[in-house]
Amino acid sequence: MTLTAESGPLAGSRTDVAGELRHVDKWYGNRHVLQDVSLQIPSGQIVALIGRSGSGKSTVLRVLAGLSHDHTGRRLVAGAPALAFQEPRLFPWRDVRTNVGYGLTRTRLPRAQVRRRAERALADVGLADHARAWPLTLSGGQAQRVSLARALVAEPRLLLLDEPFGALDALTRLSMHTLLLDLWRRHGFGVLLVTHDVDEAVALADRVLVLEDGRVVHELAIDPPRRTPGEPGAHTERYRAELLDRLGVRQ
């Protein structure tokens, strides 16, 4: 596993960390969008990042993904992170298997091997029989499954999810939660889930971070983590109330 860092050496780096930011600051013009942000995503953990619109959640994800370089502080990732967004961003003129294979662009693998790995990734998300389908024929849930397959085809240690289920209906969302947890259990990657949905954060995460005006202002460990989406947990309302209070939402 390759550890990569920016903005100076990372003393004490450990291979059980999938992704980490240390004292990161970022500006957009005169706006200080990230202020001394430090966070860690251990391998095999799901960390949710919640906050109001404009709090800097997607910027944190972009810095971790290596898509933003004009920041101060330190970034540590295990290998190349994978991303999935709210919009699947599939190429409509390429079939599903080819879209998934684009997740291996950096590897320069032979074409036949790319096809095999893409087909295996599609089987992983329950779409083995859709390899030759066209993106425009897919439902919203199927398209998001293809997006996950593309993210995971390169076998990343860190998966970054930016509101991936926000555009789906309630039942499809629960199905995607179950799929994500199944993939997480089987592959053991670390996850940073950016979401505006407090219930989703409590349902999926080991830890929830609250971002406010570019700062991490609260961290909540979900103990024990609830791993059965759609089923109520005795602790759910308590955690939900605490997070809503930190977000300034009156119940």
Swiss-Prot record:
Recorded coiled-coil stretches: none
Record bears the keyword ATP-binding: yes
Subunit field text: The complex is composed of two ATP-binding proteins (SsuB), two transmembrane proteins (SsuC) and a solute-binding protein (SsuA).
Enzyme Commission number, as recorded: 7.6.2.14
UniProt keyword annotation of Cell membrane present: yes
Protein's name according to its UniProt entry: Aliphatic sulfonates import ATP-binding protein SsuB
Record-level Gene Ontology MF annotations: ATP binding; ATP hydrolysis activity
Major localization listed first in the record, in broad terms: membrane
Membrane topology: Peripheral membrane protein
InterPro entries hit by this protein: AAA+_ATPase, ABC_transporter-like_ATP-bd, ABC_transporter-like_CS, ABC_transporter_ATP-bind, P-loop_NTPase
Reactions this protein catalyses: ATP + H2O + aliphatic sulfonate-[sulfonate-binding protein]Side 1 = ADP + phosphate + aliphatic sulfonateSide 2 + [sulfonate-binding protein]Side 1
Role noted for this protein: Part of the ABC transporter complex SsuABC involved in aliphatic sulfonates import. Responsible for energy coupling to the transport system.
GO cellular component: plasma membrane
Record-linked PANTHER family: ALIPHATIC SULFONATES IMPORT ATP-BINDING PROTEIN SSUB, TAURINE IMPORT ATP-BINDING PROTEIN-RELATED
Binding sites annotated in the UniProt record for ATP: 51-58
